[in-house]
Amino acid sequence: KVLEILKKFNAKATFFCIGNNVKKYKDTFELIKKEGHSVGNHTFNHEKGWKTKTKDYVYSVIEANALIQSPLFRPPHGRIKFSQIKSLKKNLSSIESQQLKFIAWTVISYDWDKSLTPEDCFNNVIKNAGDGSIIVFHDSEKAVNNMIPTLTKVLEYYTDKGYTFEKLGVGN
């Protein structure tokens, strides 16, 4: 459904994927790439960096990277310990380490928050987004009621204003 909506608006996106989901849904992962979107690493099991031992966290990133093979990395919950960054750079191959790009966001839709409506999520995005914004949506069970209607409305709103939606890459 998400890919259909993106296609309808000629929008490209970057999907930060959880390795375990890539393993379970290989066809979807391949379709994302085939349709011209970019992918990034979001660990293997969506570990919370500040609550996970450094060696376990690094292993999760490396395990996910074996499947995802992207220099783009977004720490789950946007948090990572300095020791984990240092260890990642040390434990990845020299080429992977040089290319590793940590990606944050400028606007989060809060689509996963069950106390919010799609309208609340939409209003949060348009209140905070502008040129060059990186907007986060979640394609997860928690976000199922908010994500699709919010994404659709955001794409309609900004497309009508002349904005385009681009994927992230190594050069961004």
Where is each model-derived feature located?
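Alpha-helical scaffolding segments of alpha/beta enzyme cores, especially the outer helices
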Residues: 4, 27-34, 59, 63-66, ...
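His/Asp/Glu-enriched short active-site or ligand-binding loop at hydrolase and phosphoryl-transfer sites
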Residues: 79, 84-128, 162-172
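Active-site beta->alpha N-cap acidic-glycine motif
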Residues: 1-70, 164
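C-terminal domain-boundary segment and adjacent tail
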Residues: 4-13, 21-24, 143-172
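A cross-domain feature marking catalytic cores of carbohydrate-active enzymes
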Residues: 17-20, 41-43, 75-77, 106, ...
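Acidic-and-aromatic substrate-binding clefts and catalytic sites of carbohydrate-active enzymes
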Residues: 16-25, 47-55, 74-82, 110-116, ...
